[in-house]
Amino acid sequence: ASLHEVCPEHADPAERADRIRGEQFAERLRDDLRQERWLYDFMLAYHSDVRDSARAATAALEGRTPLSNHDLLVQAYRATQYREGARRRATYDELVSTGSLGLIADQRMLGAAAQLYRIRTIDNLVLESLQSPYRREFRMSVDSDVQRQLARACGDRYIRPGDYAGMGEVLGFPCKIELPPAAIDAAAEGLRSNPALLRALRLRLADLETRMVDFTGNNREVFQALHEVTGDPP
């Protein structure tokens, strides 16, 4: 061996400690990125279903596509929905705040994390959904009992974080509202006769489609890098 080569067990104690800390940080960061990858994949799948409902409700209210009163209520309700997700960035923030980024040997993973935590796609999506005029208009227009039945029969199903198989079953499943036909017809007629609701729904649809472009187009390289450094899902 070269005189300049030092075996790990004979390395300077400070260097050895840094190497161990770097490995620990790297494992934590990779786990955070796996969780972030699942969240991004889930948010894309979930809000694609919300967008599809917004499209269907818009087409029905504009008179372009026939939709029964029952199905109009379901699609219009689901167009109001959104999901948040707990971000996993504590490890990266700790690396930055303590000046420890240099401890991470895997520069590709570090680069993917830096890109990921800069973009605000999820934050923008959640904020727009919370402040959506359509969500407010729908909730003011539809009878409370009808809304409760919609939430019970057609609202979100639980999904465990990290569950890839269940992503498509959280919102886009078939459902049936258990209400008298007269109540369904009255609620649907309230939607059909409300021009302010349709205008707000068009804005909601435009916002959703913009964010879907962010997920699948504008940020494609970021998500591709995230997939590469985290490997295949379990």
Model feature map: region roles:
Residues V6-P234:
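Long, hydrophobic alpha-helical segments that serve as membrane-spanning/inserting helices
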